Amino acid sequence: MKNLFRISLLALAIIFTSCSDDDDNQTLPVETNTIVDIVAGNPDFSTLGSALAITNLTSVLASEGPFTVFAPTNDAFADFLTANGFATLEDVPVDALASTLLNHVVGGAVNAADLSTGYINTSATFNGEADAPLSMYVNTSEGVMLNGISSVTTADVSADNGVIHIVDAVITLPSVVTFAAADAATFSELVGALTRADQPDYVSVLTTANGTAPAPFTVFAPTNQAFADLYAELGVAGIDDVDGAILTATLNTHVVAGANVRAEDLVTGTVATLGDAVEIDATMATITDPNGRTSQVIVTNVQAANGVIHAIDTVLLPQL
């Protein structure tokens, strides 16, 4: 009987030892807190989660990154669908939806305090060209405003692979007009000229989607200071004092239609615009108008979905 008891204890010890070894060798699942995990765990991101799944971008935002994601809420997506005439998310063309989502993603983990007013690159691209990332205009004068249409409502939601900033509107793919309107500190005078009542409907033309003529556009955009210098040169008080026909011819001279010409693709020579031709010196980054007046390119490659903007320091005039 004693021997039987000892054998039973020995067997029990072996079983416990075996179980203990199994527990020691068992690999426990590692909990993650990626951007995708946060989206999945927040009911106010359910539409965003569905959009990522539809476009096969879920795996991208679950990868190592790091990424900064400006994440629209369900209400933001609802407003986007209504504004664009879509009944459901599934009605949005997949390629367009994917580009729109990528327009909310920036490489690197950037906290709100590290954002400053100016242009940054998103993960969306012009016409699928990797070397032509779409720009985003960030305005930090009052909170964080993106492209003039979307505000950060909750910042710095930390993830294992980056950071999320919650926004109140979908950041739609920008046109060249988007940046002119959003960057008022630089381009408000240009916007005033483009929208003057006696001028052609430049806004409608310059919001033409890429793939539809006359898009894409290359716009040489004079800054506010450039316009101030022009008013002094012409001896007028402001844009309202410029003759209508001259203003139209002047604005046309700043737009190249049918081409998205980034700074690295500019070549020296004569370039046709919607108005008079201009002379470009690619080496010096200058543009000379028909009157021999020279303008310096001071900001390059503000990339929209339907063209590119290069800011210049002098207004180009047509042949006077």
Give the ranges of each region predicted by the language model.
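Mature, structured domains of secreted/extracytosolic soluble proteins
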Residues: 3-7, 19-320
